[in-house]
Amino acid sequence: MSKRVLLTGATGFVGRQVFRQLAAHDVRLTVAVREGKQSSLEENPSVDTVIRSPDLFAKTAEWWSNALHGIDTVIHCAWYAEPGLYLQSPKNLDCLQGTLNMAKGASRAGVRRFAGVGTCFEYDLSHGMLSVETPLKPLPPYAGAKAAT
């Protein structure tokens, strides 16, 4: 039996690249995308299921538990990222709470791995080149919410 992966944000800046890599390795994918987002995901043979929602971050842990039934791994790339607005937006708190609900639902559904994708903004950028040892120093709300998840 092959492993099943749920990818959020599959049409976004980072998620699109993650999707390409997973599809190239014949991973069975369920993708969760924002309703109304035009894409050709359904036509990709690696995609088993497309979950569309007007707001993935408004879903409850119970909803996620049901949606994640049979999923082995969640790769969470979705986040509010409107250019020029996202770093200071209070919508980051909605993303934080929604991500926690998703993680709780994943745990209840028996998901074995949950990977939340971050960015460089969580780190102390005064250290120059970033590495896994670079200390966290999230300054804008976006970075704080990402670091909290």
Indicate where each model-derived feature is located.
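N-terminal Rossmann NAD(P)H-binding glycine-rich loop of SDR-like oxidoreductase domains
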Residues: 3-25
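Structural motif
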Residues: 4, 72-73, 113
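N-terminal Rossmann-fold cofactor-binding loop
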Residues: 32-37
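Short, conserved SAM-binding/catalytic segment
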Residues: 38-48
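Conserved catalytic-core motifs of eukaryotic protein kinase domains, centered on the activation segment
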Residues: 42, 83-91, 125-129
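NAD(P)H-binding glycine-rich loop region in Rossmannoid oxidoreductase-like domains
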Residues: 52-97, 105
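Conserved Rossmann-fold NAD(P)-dependent oxidoreductase catalytic core, especially the SDR/UDP-sugar
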Residues: 76, 100-141
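Active-site Tyr-X1-5-Lys
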Residues: 139-149
